[in-house]
A protein has these predicted regions:
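Short, low-complexity N-terminal leaders and the immediately following helix N-cap/first helix
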Residues: 1-88
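Solvent-exposed alpha-helices and their adjacent loops that cap or buttress functional pockets
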Residues: 7-11, 29, 83-86, 126-128, ...
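C-terminal terminal segments
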Residues: 29, 85, 100-119, 126-129, ...
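Residue-level recognition of short, solvent-exposed, well-ordered loop/turn junctions
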Residues: 32, 38, 43, 123, ...
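Flexible, glycine/charged-enriched surface loops at secondary-structure junctions
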Residues: 55-56, 81-86, 144-146, 204-208, ...
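Glycine-rich phosphate/diphosphate-binding loop of Rossmann-like nucleotide-binding domains
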Residues: 158-213, 217
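Short glycine/threonine-rich loop/turn motifs
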Residues: 179, 206-339
């Protein structure tokens, strides 16, 4: 690569895309990498402020930005992602299907600390739809040493930095608890809310019951849902507070399920319970009343991970404290907001 005056560039091969920016009109490459400069191009180049140009001068020890972006893209990409054509030295990845985005933050920081290169991603543990943008990759200079890119590739290993996990759970049970609902004193308005949320992920409710605040009944219903009705996840509503009549946490514990956490540093949703039942680790969740009336709660944060069979730990739930406060915005933009970005 060498630098020459634009007026002297006729017949030279451009090393990179040249971008024209007109506010509110366009931001695109007016000439692409590999273009052979023609006499009529000179006025156009000068009009976009290019009085000097980098033109190609072969050097086998260096990689062009487009080729380096391809390496960074390969470091990130898994099988459920589509890549954009390289443009202005940048490649972007988009979701090829709905799923849960996972980001290896440790290795991502390694790449971005290496110098002269960058990968920018969405937050990990974010639910995404088909076509959603996931990341962008490029190097900072126009050229970079081949050896440097090879070292980065070797350090990152064979596992992609990004994973897009499909939603595997398709069948759920909803157990509404509470004497007031069981005896018909009030209508069960919790179950329809959960059915609507589950439908967003194409999850079918295969078993639903309204139960009294009797631990033995709730325990039996959880086991029936899993062992007889084929539920791959059980949602228990109500009975999650410290009131003497609220017995749902005890009922879940009595199934023998492994309790991950009773309580979460998230508002709304502090009285949330997460557990896993049996060898297949079927998720059994205790949902506080806020899930019924608040637009977004801890349930919305945990649900995509549960559906993707991505086991949640107590430490990860604890990490939700930073960013765990929903601001209850007048217009909700979740997940395109700061809520739940702590893990």
């Amino acid at each position: 690569m060498k630098l020459i005056c634009t007026e002297d560039a006729v017949g030279s091969v451009l090393c990179h895309d040249l971008t024209q920016i007109i506010k509110g009109v366009t931001k695109d490459a007016v000439f692409r990498k590999g273009h052979v400069v023609q006499p009529e191009d000179i006025p156009v180049l000068l009009s976009i402020g290019k009085e000097h140009l980098y033109v190609w001068e072969a050097d086998e020890s260096m990689l062009h930005e487009n080729d380096a972006a391809r390496i960074l893209c390969d470091i990130c990409k898994n099988t459920m992602m589509d890549e954009s054509p390289v443009k202005e030295g940048k490649i972007e990845l988009a979701a090829a299907a709905d799923g849960l985005l996972k980001v290896d933050g440790t290795r991502l920081r390694l790449v971005n600390s290496f110098g002269q290169m960058m990968i920018a991603t969405r937050h990990g543990n974010t639910p995404v739809k088909k076509g959603d943008k996931l990341c962008g990759t490029r190097i900072i200079p126009l050229l970079i040493e081949k050896e440097k890119m090879q070292r980065v590739r070797e350090l990152c290993g064979d596992e992609p930095l990004l994973q897009l996990l499909p939603y595997k759970i398709k069948k759920a049970a909803v157990l509404a608890t509470g004497s007031e609902v069981f005896h018909g004193r009030i209508k069960d308005t919790f179950t329809p809310v959960l059915e609507e949320k589950l439908a967003e992920f194409n999850v079918e409710v295969v078993y639903k019951q309204v139960l009294d605040d009797k631990p033995e009944q709730i325990t039996a219903a959880i086991k029936t849902a899993i062992e007889e009705k084929g539920a791959e996840m059980v949602l228990c509503t109500g009975g999650m507070s410290v009131d003497p009549d609220d017995r749902t946490p005890l009922a879940i514990k009595n199934t023998g399920a492994r309790i991950v956490s009773y309580g979460a540093p998230v508002l709304p949703g502090a009285m949330f319970l997460l557990s896993y039942y049996g060898e297949k680790q079927v998720p059994v969740l205790g949902l506080p009343g806020c899930v019924m009336y608040a637009k977004r709660t801890v349930f919305d944060l945990v649900l995509p991970r549960v559906l993707a069979c991505d086991i949640v730990t107590a430490d990860e739930l604890a990490a939700l404290g930073e960013g765990g406060l929903c601001l209850n915005c007048a217009v909700c933009t979740y997940p395109a907001c700061g809520f739940g970005k702590g893990w």
